Design a protein with these regions (language model features):
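Short beta-strand/loop turn elements enriched in aromatics
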Residues: 10-22
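Histidine-centered metal-chelating micro-motifs
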Residues: 15-16, 35, 51, 55-64, ...
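Short acidic-glycine-tyrosine-enriched beta hairpin
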Residues: 40-55
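Short, conserved beta-strand element in jelly-roll/cupin
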Residues: 19-36, 52
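Key DNA-contact positions within bacterial/archaeal DNA-binding proteins
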Residues: 200
Length: 201
């Protein structure tokens, strides 16, 4: 199989091991809350989160059983499937590997999350619709859209993290500059010229 889609519903306290094997593993949290303990990081398995494991990665899902059930849809995609879904402008596997993580939890914005949720639910029932008109093309389109949205969620999260990091770095640089020039008169004009920012910032 080049891809699988499976729903997990946990209603009692649970600890379960997952391993991606040769697949790109995407876990979309539909409701509830738990944690994913991986070798390098603890990831929040909370509603609206998308957890991604690259091939060869594992994690232990821990659900305490409180505050309602935990529902997750797991979509596994092989490199071959990503190649089939790619086009001349977009290499999906390469795009996944540009993002600097082996295990990550991202929080898509509400619009992307709602689309991912609907697509994930559709992936669960596609095997029962294989006799319908255009089933193969429809399946290809659903999978392609799911992967694009998952990657967009990663890119948005990475951009936000980079922006926040850059903002903190800029503030650190400003404070260090002020500290080094405490005995001098520092005007906003001078700070503007030193750091190429507007005084409004």
């Amino acid at each position: 199989m080049n891809y699988t889609a499976k729903r997990y519903l946990f209603e009692q306290s649970t600890v379960r091991e997952f391993f991606s094997g040769a697949y790109y593993d995407l876990f979309l949290v539909m409701r509830g809350s738990g944690v994913f303990r991986c070798s390098e990081v603890v990831l929040p398995a909370q509603q609206q989160n998308l957890i991604i494991l690259k091939p060869g990665q594992g994690g232990r899902l821990e659900y305490a059983g409180a505050y309602g059930p935990l529902e997750i849809i797991r979509v596994q995609l092989s490199p071959q499937m990503l190649a089939q879904l790619s086009d001349e402008d977009t290499d999906f596997e390469k795009s996944f590997n540009v993002v600097p993580f082996r295990q990550v939890a991202v929080r898509p914005d509400s619009q992307i999350y709602m689309l991912l949720k609907n697509l994930a639910r559709k992936l669960l029932v596609l095997p029962q619709e294989s006799s319908q008109f255009g089933a193969a093309a429809f399946e290809h389109g659903i999978l392609q859209m799911f992967v694009v949205l998952a990657l967009r969620a990663c890119i948005h999260a990475e951009f936000h993290t980079a922006s926040v990091s850059r903002h903190h770095l800029m503030l650190d640089e400003v404070f260090l500059f002020i500290q080094a020039h405490l005995t001098e008169e520092l005007t906003l004009d001078r700070l503007e010229k030193e750091f190429f920012v507007s005084r409004e910032h």
